[in-house]
A protein has these predicted regions:
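Pyridoxal 5′-phosphate
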Residues: 2-137
């Protein structure tokens, strides 16, 4: 156990840089694939946000958004519609409720978390699935 802790501690900076690179890659790919997407809060600003989380508001109608999580789940993509502290709640995120406009609250927001176990090919898959979903009839 002690060796695992030491190894983990010694890898913190390397893992942080790897994860930050993934987050930046995701930002670059998603903004070019889904131009009307909005970042919730300042999550895309690496100077003022955590390096492992992004929360986005997608340009999808309320009716179509009902199928979004189901579609992502079928494709093997794990993400969340709410904040971690609201897990299991139907009231929505109090943070998103306070920072989003009424029209943006009607659109789906998704939270993506990145770790040292993710890779760019997984991000490419997420971007393709989201882009295909948004552009489908």
């Amino acid at each position: 156990m002690e060796l695992a802790f030491i190894d983990s501690y010694n890898s913190i900076e390397k893992n942080k840089n790897y994860i930050l690179d993934l987050k930046n890659y995701f930002i670059e790919k998603i903004t070019s694939s889904i131009p009307l997407l909005k970042f919730n809060g300042i999550c895309e600003d690496n100077n003022y946000s955590t390096y492992s989380i992004l929360n986005v508001c997608l340009p999808v109608s309320k009716d179509k958004s009902v199928l979004l999580e189901f579609n992502l789940d079928l494709k093997g993509i794990a993400c969340s519609r709410g904040s971690a502290c609201q897990s299991g709640s139907n009231t929505g995120s109090h943070v998103l409720n306070s920072i989003l406009t009424k029209s943006d609250l009607e659109k789906p927001s998704l939270r993506f978390s990145f770790s040292k176990y993710n890779n760019k090919s997984e991000i490419d898959k997420v971007i393709k699935v989201l882009s295909d979903f948004i552009n489908s009839n």
